[in-house]
Amino acid sequence: MDTGLCVPLRGISGLLLLLCALPWAEGAKVLVLPMEGSQWLSMRDVVRELHARGHQTVVLASEVTVHIKGEDFFTLKTYAFPYTKEEYQQEILSDIEKTFKTQHFVKAFFETTASIRNFFDLYSNSCIALLHNKMLIQQLNSSFFDVILTDPIFPCGAVLAKYLQIPAVFILRSLSCGIEYEATQCPNPSSYIPNLLTRLSDHMDFLQRVQNMLYYLVLKYICRLSITPYESLASELLQREVSLVEVLSHASVWLFRGDFVLDYPRPIMPNMVFIGGINCVTKKPLSQEFEAYVNASGEHGIVVFSLGSMVSEIPEKKAMEIAEALGRIPQTVLWRYTGTRPSNLAKNTILVKWLPQNDLLGHPKTRAFITHSGSHGIYEGICNGVPMVMMPLFGDQMDNAKRMETRGAGVTLNVLEMTADDLENALKTVINNKSYKENIMRLSSLHKDRPIEPLDLAVFWVEYVMRHKGAPHLRPAAHDLTWYQYHSLDVIGFLLAIVLTVVFIVFKCCAYGCRKCFGGKGRVKKSHKSKTH
């Protein structure tokens, strides 16, 4: 009997092939230990996408967290922190306030060193509070997570992954002393790869290479002081002596928030993946408020001004200098600022507590971007093709600014020393000199010419690690070598010993031959002369 449900055999075969071609997916469990600030924004996008693909995500943060809030696409777990929320915020803000103080180089260096140590002390105490919470650790251990996603600048996640024997994926911009290259066994020659905080390019003269080497040694010393608490904690948990390099080398994949449009070309390892621009999302329509600001700017357009999520207030004197400079340009300026309103603020400058930075940068009327040179802001500027005036404040921001300036896509100002004239001239330069717009558009084109979006690439590698229970096949054998084996010093010594031995034997043979040939004649002549006498 014909029921009308007959399907041609060819159709069934096609359906089966289609089903077989679909990627096999099973919801996995992801534990996330994020870092505060803009670092969380990138990780948050990855977490959201993992949730959309059916994975369960638990985000572990301290109870005094400032930026990490509970959302519907992950479960937020908090742990006790040895500071109150007010003390925690004060610790962070006090270091930021120091960036606006003019100091002698030596004093600034020691204060920066102290700030780095305070930063590590703050988070190492947080790590101790977390890892000594036996009940929480037992809960995490019994939850059978498939992967830990963490930023190794807060090494607690790496220590926890090593302790629980869970595959780890790191997402980061960089670490303070190049320890990421030791942990991945990635070559890092100081001859053409500038170290963090040096503000050097990849083309260095002799004195700059000396400076680069000295910076490396100083950062190594600071790092040694700063990471000791984590090494002690890891050794206590694992019940054996362990270095932080060994703990970090446990990572299956390293996701670096950079690419070679911004960063200088360098060697990489198989488990190093570059996801620069992961925060560049599709431009959304502006709200009525901001659309009105943009439309009112007329033919001159707008300038977007933001110093990032960590800085929204600056000293009054400096704010007035900035306000004076902004009032001299014809563009409308949208300035994210929550401090006291400068008394000389011009009519063309609008203060806002928050602004949709990426959406504004993507608007065709945006002429320039004043930024602190954080990697998120830099990449949003690159993605949207907006030339920049950069005011780096701390950390890798100086290096990011140097890279963009080297590529002719922006102008860098020293926020401590600049005057209103300096800022005015910088803005007019990047707006009126067409080469800056052309260079940033070229960088934007290079950055966007890729086979896969950075967010999809990041999620792929997280799922890859979960599917295969890690990625040990990407781990180089260099991890198993001693320092002298890595540099082949034992081989060089062995070959040198052979060469020296051969040279010694040849020398002895020649000396023996000479004695036989010439020494005998000399004795005969001497004997003959004696007989004559």
Curated annotation (Swiss-Prot):
User: What's the protein's topology in the membrane?
Assistant: Single-pass membrane protein
Where does it reside?
Answer: Microsome; Endoplasmic reticulum membrane
Which N-terminal residues, if any, form the signal peptide? 1-27
Q: Where are the transmembrane segments?
A: 491-511
Principal place of residence = other
Stored SUPFAM superfamilies: UDP-Glycosyltransferase/glycogen phosphorylase
* PANTHER family per the UniProt record, alphabetical: EG:EG0003.4 PROTEIN-RELATED (PTHR48043), UDP GLUCURONOSYLTRANSFERASE FAMILY 1 MEMBER A1 (PTHR48043:SF161)
Q: Which Pfam families match?
A: UDPGT
Q: Which gene encodes it?
A: Ugt1a2
Instruction: List the keywords (alphabetical).
Output: Endoplasmic reticulum, Glycoprotein, Glycosyltransferase, Membrane, Microsome, Signal, Transferase, Transmembrane, Transmembrane helix
Q: What is this protein called?
A: UDP-glucuronosyltransferase 1-2
